[in-house]
């Protein structure tokens, strides 16, 4: 009899602004442990029932070094018998972690696992970041595009596929509007677990650092008051180009976790799953246009499950840049009314390793509200890849 992997709970921090937000001084194990503990609590299981923890993290150094999944599990109060591993597929790390955890349930007899993701851009992507030998000279000579910044690749997509600033800003404005409406309706409330932590505050004049206890209960990034005129006034990062702070995802901190178990265990416990993991694929594209990755991954995923674009009721795309969402949406023929229905990372933020897990939790909760059947979580990936995961929503 085939074992199905079902997601029975999800929990995430609110997304904090990198460097100047509430999570700018929160260490990785503590942040990861906070969402793991809450996901276990929401699932109504004993901590010792978890066999393995899989967490995605794109920048595994500093506070995230040496397996933050295992450290987070211990910090969550899970017993030492609970194992942990940390995965890096850049922006798809959180989704990859959920896929690995789900496959362990489907194929290896694991009854309960945690899949999720985490990123602290504040504590890792800073002046202390280890850049020793960050470039392999031989790879640079062979494929220099592997070392392009994500921003540079976004400009390539804009130029190559003729997607202008106006279209990008128009998309971003709609993103902020959708997030604003979702916030008013409380559509993120069931995902977020408030987090009391110690925030670092830097005095602009003296540079002195003080610390303040704060509670983060809502995403810090959204600006629903954004106007078209305001977006148009923001200067592009590169002079004469199209990508600006208004049409790109923000630098952010955050963590998310989902409890995944076998369908038989869920039935035995009388738990009603949020959804069923159905499949995951990754695909490579040219690294200089990494933003188009979903265009390679999604058809592969759908073909393996005998589905078409129109069979999918909800789509969540990581939204690294407006330009890549526009290209992927239009190239694949995705209905805009089914895509990022409550906004995305341009407004909320994009903690690289966390996002895939956040989107999974959100698509399952929103899918249930909308009586949807199938949802796809997808993203572009630094280095030139795309990933996509298929979930069936349970009502």
Protein language model regions, located:
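Conserved catalytic cysteine-centered active-site region
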Residues: 57-111, 145-152, 225-250, 331-359, ...
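Flexible glycine-/small-residue-enriched beta->alpha junction loops
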Residues: 102, 106-160
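Condensing-enzyme catalytic core mediating Claisen C-C bond formation in acyl metabolism
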Residues: 1-28, 226-292, 296, 303, ...
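Short, well-ordered amphipathic alpha-helical segments that serve as non-catalytic structural scaffolds
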Residues: 28-44, 68-72, 97, 150-157, ...
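Conserved active-site "lid/cap" helical segment
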Residues: 1-58, 62-64, 68-72, 76, ...
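Active-site-proximal alpha-helical scaffold in enzymes
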Residues: 87-118, 158-188, 257-264, 329, ...
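N-terminal extracellular/periplasmic Venus flytrap/periplasmic-binding protein-like
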Residues: 12-14, 25, 29-34, 167-268, ...
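Active-site pocket-lining segment
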Residues: 55, 152-155, 191-193, 197-201, ...
């Amino acid at each position: 009899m085939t074992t199905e992997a079902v997601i029975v709970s999800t929990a995430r921090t609110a997304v904090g602004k990198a460097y100047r937000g509430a999570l700018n001084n929160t260490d990785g194990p503590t942040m990861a442990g906070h969402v793991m503990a809450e996901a276990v609590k929401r699932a109504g299981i004993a901590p010792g029932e978890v066999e393995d923890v899989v967490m995605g993290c794109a920048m595994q150094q500093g506070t995230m070094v040496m397996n933050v999944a295992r450290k987070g599990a211990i910090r969550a109060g899970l017993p030492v018998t609970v194992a942990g591993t940390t995965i890096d597929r850049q922006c798809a790390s959180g989704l990859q972690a959920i896929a690995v955890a789900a496959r362990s349930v489907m194929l290896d007899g694991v009854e309960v696992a945690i899949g999720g993701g985490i990123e602290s851009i504040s504590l890792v992507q800073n002046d202390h970041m280890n850049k020793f030998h960050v470039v392999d000279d031989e790879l640079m000579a062979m494929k220099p595009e592997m070392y392009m910044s994500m921003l540079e690749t976004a400009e390539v997509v804009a130029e190559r596929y003729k997607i202008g600033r106006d279209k990008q800003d128009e998309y971003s404005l709609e993103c902020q509007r959708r997030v604003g409406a979702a916030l008013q309706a409380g559509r993120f409330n069931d995902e977020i677990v408030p987090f009391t932590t110690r925030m670092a505050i830097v005095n602009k004049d003296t540079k002195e650092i003080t610390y303040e206890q704060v509670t983060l209960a809502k995403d810090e990034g959204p600006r629903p008051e954004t106007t078209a005129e305001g977006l148009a006034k923001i200067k592009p990062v590169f002079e004469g180009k199209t990508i600006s702070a208004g049409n790109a995802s923000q630098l952010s901190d955050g963590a998310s976790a989902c409890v995944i178990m076998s369908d038989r265990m869920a039935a035995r416990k009388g738990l009603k799953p949020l959804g069923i993991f159905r499949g995951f694929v990754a695909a490579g594209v040219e690294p200089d246009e990494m933003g188009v990755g979903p265009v390679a991954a999604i058809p592969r995923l759908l073909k393996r499950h005998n589905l078409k674009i129109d069979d999918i009721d909800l789509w969540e795309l990581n939204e690294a840049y407006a330009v890549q969402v526009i290209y992927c949406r239009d190239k694949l023929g995705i209905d805009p009314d089914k895509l990022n229905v409550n906004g995305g990372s341009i407004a909320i933020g994009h903690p690289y390793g966390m996002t895939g897990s956040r989107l999974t939790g959100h698509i399952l909760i929103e899918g249930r509200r909308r009586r949807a059947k199938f949802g796809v979580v997808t993203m572009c990936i630094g280095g030139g890849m795309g990933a996509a995961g298929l979930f069936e929503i349970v009502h």
